[in-house]
Swiss-Prot record:
Gene ablation phenotype (knockout): Loses the ability to produce yanuthone D. Also leads to the loss of production of yanuthone X1 which does not have 6-methylsalicylic acid (6-MSA) as a precursor.
Pathway per the UniProt entry: Secondary metabolite biosynthesis; terpenoid biosynthesis
Family of the protein in this entry: Belongs to the short-chain dehydrogenases/reductases (SDR) family.
Keyword set includes Disulfide bond: no
Disulfide bonds: none
Name the UniProt record assigns to this protein: Short chain dehydrogenase yanD
Origin species: Aspergillus niger (strain ATCC 1015 / CBS 113.46 / FGSC A1144 / LSHB Ac4 / NCTC 3858a / NRRL 328 / USDA 3528.7)
EC main group: oxidoreductase
GO MF term list: oxidoreductase activity
UniProt gene name: yanD
Length: 330
């Protein structure tokens, strides 16, 4: 049961210095992505790669970041690059990854923040339902495309690269339980792509469950001395995610946000705790706020385990048609 009032979160510990480090932040032009980028630069991050769908908007973000007093004080001459990444399209993911591998020798940190929520059923160019494509499929492809590059960088630096994937406790309440169960003879992605299986207010939850299930399958296949991967839920944060709601619902939700939601700064602390502070013990784990938690009941249930197994097999089959997969994806 989610408590209405969220617990107090302490700031990041002092003394974090990211001089010489490079971070890639997806969905970096607004909301949590922009806030995380700002906080990283205040921590003296040398190079920030803003992976954004709208390059013009991303370029405007550079100007605002360079005008931030905290960045001017602690990190007056960072390198900030904008690169196009449209998570709605596989070809954009692959072009982004190719350019990154060619132009950025070492990536120390990859923050998978880009995501969408929608109450409308739409299809991406791949044929997948759009929320599934953006939140799940494209993130998996991006990790597959960049994993060897992250590992190579870790060998150069002597420190593991980090992948921190922004998740949500909402994965605990998917539509699969009651409203739109996956049939025994039905594929997971096949189910997600059926319009009749689209439950508007739970589709975001569904995709976040797919993300955490994939992470639980992938993490044991990775060497945490080379790459540490984790996921976290920053709780309800005061961002523009509710803008997709109809006006009458948005008004209600905005009242709840005004009472309950955390400032974006606090959400940034939670994401960067997973990315920078949590140690190797966080590898393959879900952090609720800053706390490493056990797998949720839905994940460990027979239904969850069946979905996890099928999802891994289906995802690997699809990804193998798009790219040469690293050994850990086989």
């Amino acid at each position: 049961m989610v408590k209405f009032f969220q617990p107090k979160i302490d700031p990041l510990p002092t003394g974090i210095d990211l001089t010489g480090k490079t971070a890639v932040i997806t969905g970096a032009s607004a909301g949590m992505g922009l806030e995380v980028t700002k906080q990283l630069l205040r921590l003296r991050l040398s190079t920030a790669i803003l992976a954004v769908r709208n390059v013009t908007k991303g370029e405007a973000c550079i100007k605002s970041l360079l005008q931030d007093r905290g960045i001017q004080t602690h990190n007056p001459k960072p390198t900030i690059k904008v690169m196009e990444l449209d998570m709605d399209r596989y070809d954009s993911v692959q072009q982004f990854a190719k350019t990154l591998r060619e132009e950025v020798p070492v990536v120390d940190l990859l923050i998978l923040n880009a995501g969408v929520a929608s109450l409308n059923f739409e299809r991406s160019p791949s044929g997948h339902e759009r929320v599934t494509q953006v939140n799940y499929c494209s993130n998996v492809l991006l990790v597959a495309e960049l994993l060897p590059h992250l590992e190579a960088g870790a060998e150069q630096t002597g420190s593991p690269a980090r992948i921190s994937w922004v998740g949500s406790r909402s994965h605990e309440t998917p539509s699969f339980e009651k409203k739109a169960p996956i049939e025994a003879d039905e594929g997971v992605l096949e189910h997600m792509d059926k319009e009749e299986a689209f439950v508007p207010f739970q589709r975001y939850n569904d995709t976040k469950l797919l993300c955490v299930l994939f992470l639980y399958s992938l993490a044991p296949r990775l060497d945490p001395k080379k790459v540490v991967i984790n996921t976290m839920c920053p709780g309800m944060v005061n961002t523009g995610m509710s803008n997709m709601l109809p006006l009458h619902l948005r008004l209600i939700f905005n009242v709840i946000k005004a009472i309950r939601a955390r400032p974006v700064e606090v959400g940034g602390w939670i994401i960067l705790n997973a990315a920078l502070v949590a140690g190797p013990e966080s590898h393959g784990k879900f952090l609720a706020d800053k706390t490493i938690t056990d797998k949720s009941a839905i994940v460990t249930s027979p239904m969850g385990q069946d979905i996890q197994k099928k999802l891994w097999e289906e995802t690997i089959t699809e990804m193998s048609k798009l790219t040469t997969l690293p050994p850990q994806f086989r």
